[in-house]
Amino acid sequence: MAPPSVPIVYAGGRGGCPGGYHGLVLYVPRGLLEETRAHLLREAPKEGVGLWAGRREVERVIPLPNVHPSPLTAYLADPLALLKALKALEREGLSLLAIYHSHPKGPALPSPRDIKEARWRVPYVIFGTDGVRAFLLPEGQEVALVVL
């Protein structure tokens, strides 16, 4: 996986705007970006999946098991692990900032399945063979990734 091709984000904005996007930008420290990349490389050739959480920027990477029946070409976060992670975030006062997953053999673009199955109103961060990008789905609007 190549380095990011675009500047990473948050639902809340770096300068304020609690609860909303500020200029459609997601901020992620380089170390957490690399931690995410390492998780996804360990999952290859399967698609990996996880969450980014924090307040004004990504503060935590939460890998989740991919329980999809076809994990080489799709992902489905384990529902129980997802629920436990979301409850822990709530207890800790952190917000879900993004859902990440990998396309180990394809580009960092939403697949038709990614678009069809999008349910969460947070950016979907996709790590592909050509880098990493983030999108609001199903609309397809790109979210800038600012690496700190």
Swiss-Prot record:
A motif (JAMM motif) lies at residues 101-114. InterPro entries: JAB_dom_prok, JAMM/MPN+_dom, VirAsm_ModProt. Keywords: Hydrolase, Metal-binding, Metalloprotease, Protease, Zinc. The record marks S111 as: Transition state stabilizer. Gene3D superfamilies: Cytidine Deaminase, domain 2. Its cofactor is Zn(2+). Belongs to the peptidase M67B family. Probable metalloprotease that cleaves the ubiquitin-like modifier protein TtuB from protein conjugates, hydrolyzing the isopeptide bond between a lysine residue of the target protein and the C-terminal glycine of the modifier protein. Does not seem to work for all the TtuB conjugates. This is Probable TtuB-protein conjugate cleaving protease. It comes from Thermus thermophilus (strain ATCC BAA-163 / DSM 7039 / HB27).
